[in-house]
């Protein structure tokens, strides 16, 4: 099951991509793709839904940030040897931990604005773990 959020930025709707690759509207089932929807109970509820009975989404709408209601984003930098070598930096002896604003998350094809004064942007990020406190 591939969960997505689609639509205009700031007004995304919940959806899923079915086994045939077709985008389906999930808004009759859940209000949005939130951390609560990703709990075992929430995922069990979604697995019970028959995707072919959900409305098909027409066209190719924008895909947004995959998760709504994102809290704090804690990151670890330079934790892969290959990436450190790509950016010509040594691996740190201790993990480099930093926090990102949740506004840094975007859809896969959204433009990325370079902050004023920024000289370089790093393109690589891996999602390792999402901690949910309900």
Task: Put a short name on every predicted segment.
Residues 91-108, 121-123:
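Structural signature of FAD isoalloxazine-binding scaffolds in flavoprotein oxidoreductases
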Residues 63-65, 85-88, 112-121, 126-127:
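A generic local secondary-structure boundary/capping motif
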Residues 1-95:
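N-terminal non-catalytic cap/leader segment that marks the start of a structured domain
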